[in-house]
Amino acid sequence: MTVKAPNFKLISTSNEVVELNKIKSKLIVLYFYPKDDTPGCTLETKDFNSLISKFSKNNCSVYGISKDSLESHKKFKKKYKIKFDLLSDEKKIAIKAYKVWGKKQFMGKEFMGLIISSFLIKNKKIIKEWRSVRVKNHAQEVLNYILDK
């Protein structure tokens, strides 16, 4: 089952406005993460970064999205030599459209936050989604799904 991927326009670490519906790649991976430079989010981003050439060989663009500022994203990208764009969603436009903002629990306390999730998009449709992701090996899991298709 596929569903139309919500379009959005967000500013990238390349200082360009990225509009989902105008991305030329055959496949697009959007991975949503809570915060730059935190242990789990850094692990996930570094894993996608280490596999970026394999995603590219399969005509797949990868974008990381969080509500961090563009300045925060740029520092994060530079620190870890990330080879793809991060998108700043401070107003939670894509975050809400993809329904990745919700109740979370940490150390017995409930709060609202970004739920780590990824989406694979083809022809403006979501063809696969991963919600409440465990970050270890997730990038490889996404790549394996693409290679198996």
Give the location of each predicted region.
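Chalcogenol-based redox active-site neighborhoods
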Residues: M1-K149
